[in-house]
Structure formats: structure tokens, C-alpha cells
């Protein structure tokens, strides 16, 4: 795992997050530090690079389509399904990889969404059975993992919705009310630290499978499924809706990579860049001013990749192309791709959650067999 240096401030030890050294009048970031031991050998004492940390205790059972987020000192994974059932299970991990069973959701749920506002982790919507319709329920967990029933999604039951944080809000967007129906939703709902529910301006187009990420003071909701397979790209949409910390709605330039489709879009943030991709090595990149560029950041084209953020890194894990992959692509804050150890088990669509400098990829499935689900939890540290 990553090595750390601590400095004393006010009689307390604080972890040093970044180190710089002056070279030619410029500050250069230190990636690794070594110290000489008594035998004269150089020992690594500090690393600012993302590293594979092995596996954490496995999930209680193999599942896919969980939702993951964090609150306080815990990364949380909730719900999900296997080949025959959906689950209400909630499992939490701290930065030491200790697993804790939290209070269950108020009902089984798969294809739900998760987001945190700093005070609570929220799990919203989903479906109770493998082919059932959407739910309106929202469960909130505080930093002690105490569960509270938050206000229901106010406009419609929903599954396959997107979630992320902006400012003091956990925000949920889009989705679909019925499992096998073409109707899609444009509703956007925000929850604050008092569990107050606020309806924000709707998405520009109703869609499910929208991908939400947080970029500074913005929440970006990108891509998704229109429900109309005859509308081009099998119904996928390239829209990018943006909400600021006051929930003011604007739009950014559309996604540009026609090969990526935009269904099951992956998204993550590296430093001051939001990165989106799927079915391609090319990525659409939005900076802090919401200006879009494109670049080749992934090592291999694959579908079902999970994107997540830890420290200043964007991490894209797993997928299938055409066989299941263990590949983990890492992009740093300068958009440089870094190689790292892959997943311990090849799979697509693991669920990600980050606590502090620790990123966990949990569960996932093998789409080449009938719902072959995994309970593996891989750990990366920044």
C-alpha cells in the first residue's frame, strides 16, 4: 500500500498529502521518497502514487448493480442482485479494510443510486426483484451508520437513476419508472444535511443510466438511455447537464465519442478534470470551466468499465472486450495514464466507493454466463 509521511501540527500528527521540491526555480511534485536504513539501504518512506492494496474481506454474497458511496469514515455498498434475487444488504468498510454490517435497506433493491452530502449517505430508488418496477424509497445513513428514512423521491418511482454530490447536496437525476418500458424521467432531486428534499430543474432530456460525477462546484450528469432504440446509437444520449452548488442548471458540450454509445457510461475525476468513456479508449474530458476536450486515456477498448476517483486520480476498472478484463487504467491530475496492478478477479461493472485515500471495487459479474456474480473486493490506495 502507499507509504505516508506525517508532520506535527499543534501537537497532532497530520498526514502529508503532497510534497514538492524546487528544481530550476519551479516546484516539482515528489512522487516517492526514500530514507537510508542502518544497513545503508534505501527504504521507501513516502509514495504519492496510486497502488494496489490487495483485497478486503469479501461481500457476504456475490452481487452486481449495487450502489456505492461514503459517509464519515466508511465506504458503503448497498443492495444489488444475483441471478434470482435482489438484496437489502448494506456492508461498510473503513480505511483499515474492516468490514461492518450496517442496518439493511428498508427493502431489497438493485439498480439503485447512491450519493453523499457529507452528513449522510443516501441510497435512492431501485427495484425489489430482478424484473420489477422502480421504487421511490430513499434510505439515509449518518457517519455512525444509523439508518433514517428520508423523504421519498417526490415525483416518480425510479430505477437506473444517477447520483452524485454538489456542495451540501446529494443529487439524484433521471431514471425510469418501469422495468421493461420505454418511459424515461428527467426529474432531479436534491437532499441537504437536514434531509430536506428539494426539486431542482429537470434534465434537458429524460433518460436512465445517466452518469453523475462531482467536478469542483459542479455536478455533471452525462449520457444515458432515451428508451428509444430507433433514435440512433441504440437510444443512447450525449447530453451533459450541469448543476452548481446552488442547484442552478446549465449544460455543457455534448459527449463527442460516437463509438462509446453512452449507455453504461463510465465517469471519474482526475484533479480538475471530469472524464467520461465507454466502449472506447478515447475519453471526453471537461475542465473546471466545463470546456471539453478529447484524449486517448484508456489502454484497451472495453464495455462495462467502472470509473471512480481517489485522491487526484481517476481509476477505470474491469470490463469486457470481448473477454472479461482485470485491467485497471489510472489517470493522474495531468491526464497522464499510469499503469497499476489489475483486479484480482476479471469482471465487469464492479461497484466503487472511496473512503479517504482508499478506493474499493466490490462485486461485479460475468455477462458471458447467466448472472455469474462475484463477492470480491479489491483495494487501491492513493
List the model feature ranges, each with a label.
Residues 2-12, 22, 35-382:
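Kelch-like beta-propeller repeat domains
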